[in-house]
């Protein structure tokens, strides 16, 4: 099954043309993770910048029976962000805001695309400590860390 032009049009309506990649050369970097051992081109790659956009993408995908694979920076080594054929890669790196730091309750509310380093630095600036220290912390994202249990 080829990825449909109709789905691409609907995704562009949700996100804007600049946030939907469909050209083969643009899809290749999203066809593997940090291992590069497993590869599969997705149907398209989309960049969401809000929870509302994520919701609209997932609603469309569900109605159209299109698989979705979420992705941060793609530094994982387990194949977790490798797409399946004709899927939507939902890249969350542009959702990179720290929304709240609650020092009293030792919590931080962040978007999925915030880097591990930014979380660590924000905690440190508040006199707190964020213990996970992956080697990829400059580029790995919190969403990816959680999704991959890293």
Predicted regions mapped to residue ranges:
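N-terminal accessory segments
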Residues: 1-34, 63-66
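N-terminal glycine-rich flavin-associated loop
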Residues: 11, 37-68, 86, 92-135, ...
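A generic structural-conservation signal
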Residues: 19-21, 70, 132
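Short glycine-biased active-site loop of nucleotidyltransferases that positions the nucleotide triphosphate
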Residues: 34-37, 79-84
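Short, acidic (Asp/Glu-rich) active-site segment that either coordinates a divalent metal cofactor
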Residues: 78-81, 88-92
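Conserved phosphate/anionic-ligand binding catalytic regions in large, soluble enzymes, centered on
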Residues: 81, 145-146
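Beta-rich nucleic-acid/ligand-interaction surfaces
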Residues: 139-141
């Amino acid at each position: 099954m080829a990825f449909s032009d109709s789905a691409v049009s609907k995704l562009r309506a949700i996100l804007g043309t600049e946030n939907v990649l469909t050209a083969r050369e643009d899809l290749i970097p999203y066809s593997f993770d940090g291992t590069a051992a497993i590869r599969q081109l997705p149907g398209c790659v989309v960049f969401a910048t809000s929870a509302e956009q994520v919701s609209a993408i997932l609603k469309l995908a569900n109605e159209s029976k299109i698989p979705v694979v979420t992705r941060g920076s793609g530094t994982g080594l387990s194949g977790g962000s490798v797409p399946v054929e004709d899927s939507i890669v939902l890249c969350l790196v542009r959702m990179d805001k720290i929304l709240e730091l609650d020092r009293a309750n030792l919590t931080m509310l962040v978007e999925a695309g915030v880097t591990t380093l930014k979380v660590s630095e924000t905690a440190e600036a508040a006199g707190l400590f964020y213990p996970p220290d992956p080697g990829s912390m400059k580029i790995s994202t919190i969403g990816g860390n959680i999704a991959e249990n890293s």
